[in-house]
Amino acid sequence: MSKTHLTEQKFSDFALHPQVIEALESKGFHNCTPIQALALPLALSGRDVAGQAQTGTGKTLAFLASTFHYLLSHPANAERQTNQPRALIMAPTRELAVQIHSDAEALSHLTGLKLGLAYGGDGYDKQLKVLENGVDILIGTTGRLIDYAKQNHINLGAIQVVVLDEADRMYDLGFIKDIRWLFRRMPPAAQRLNMLFSATLSYRVRELAFEQMNNAEYVEVEPEQKTGHRIKEELFYPSNEEKMRLLQTLLEEEWPDRCIIFANTKHRCEDIWGHLAADGHRVGLLTGDVAQKKRLRILEEFTQGNLDILVATDVAARGLHIPSVTHVFNYDLPDDCEDYVHRIGRTGRAGQSGFSISLACEEYALNLPAIETYIGHSIPVSKYNSDALMNDLPAPKRLTRPPRSNNGPRRHNNAPRRSGAPRNNRKRAD
């Protein structure tokens, strides 16, 4: 299989439904990524698929194309009721469910198959109104799906296709009981097409997932390299006292067009946001405490380029495709080595290159050996000059204070910068 982003395999080479091919090509999708080239032939032949591939390699399009093709090629149950969707796509987070729904809209418009969305925290009545009119494909999180099912707003007895996206994350977050509850209300596995996809699939997860699948075929792309080969990784060892100053110095040096900074707790994220906002950066905060409408608005502003920096917990690390992220900063090394892969997978997507910079501080440096064992290589270490770190930083903002706008004009590249370590002052450790 080619190591490049796209293969020579075209969607039109497959026996995909003509409307699916037309919808894909209308959005500029002609050639398959490796995971699409592997998964589509299996799904089109009616085989269940468990696909593992790095983030940003086209998993979502693989299962959406398969789902739409299957529904267009197989008639619905003649006794199907209005509250019975034909396909169910389950995601671990609200943001991912919304994104999948957005990606599916082009296929929906051209094929006429109707979409529904179900996620917690917001829009209960609005989502329900769509479901009451009947949907073909329902995309959602398990909690809201169960809520609607228990109230008979939806009935899963006519499901023909089921998808688990970011399946390992769903199990890790404790959704296994919810998933099994939903599966028990569907037709048997042999009577439906089953697919699951994720960047990481442990043996435990595959074993649990295969309970609900029909002799699934396991496919993977580049299993020997868990981090994308287009991502340049770099590691620093700061003291706790110098950690924030190093981050801000690196931001001045790198001047990223669009970056995500990950930390392990919401309080740490709030602290980072406060320092960067006070320093004039256009920065957004994404944690579990941020209201759902605001979270979606922040993601939209970041995607559209109105924000340059997103500070986030791992709520934003899984499955979200935000184009043109040039840098990922691990302010804290994650406790879960799989989260490292998902975090840095926000950059270097869709054939682009990216940079991942991690800070192994005194508190989280002990997480490094497990991460390096998991990814199969050591992260290159760079040194920095403590005396050259930025030291004229303003006091951080606090969320309890009325925030100044983060949407002001970005500083131009020729704007004066504070004194900081020049690029050639950063040296790779031997």
Curated annotation (Swiss-Prot):
Its main location: cytoplasm. GO terms for molecular function: ATP binding; ATP hydrolysis activity; RNA binding; RNA helicase activity. Residues 392-430 are annotated as: Disordered. Its EC number is 3.6.4.13. The gene is rhlB. The lineage of its organism: Bacteria, Pseudomonadati, Pseudomonadota, Gammaproteobacteria, Enterobacterales. ATP binds at residues 53-60. It comes from the Bacteria. GO terms for cellular component: cytosol. Keywords: ATP-binding, Cytoplasm, Helicase, Hydrolase, Nucleotide-binding, RNA-binding. A motif (DEAD box) lies at residues 165-168. The keyword RNA-binding applies. The keyword Hydrolase applies. It is an enzyme of class 3 (hydrolase). Residues 40-219 form the Helicase ATP-binding domain. A motif (Q motif) lies at residues 9-37. HAMAP family: DEAD_helicase_RhlB. Belongs to the DEAD box helicase family. RhlB subfamily. DEAD-box RNA helicase involved in RNA degradation. Has RNA-dependent ATPase activity and unwinds double-stranded RNA. GO terms for biological process: RNA catabolic process. Residues 245-390 form the Helicase C-terminal domain. It catalyses: ATP + H2O = ADP + phosphate + H(+). It is found in: Cytoplasm. Component of the RNA degradosome, which is a multiprotein complex involved in RNA processing and mRNA degradation. This is ATP-dependent RNA helicase RhlB.
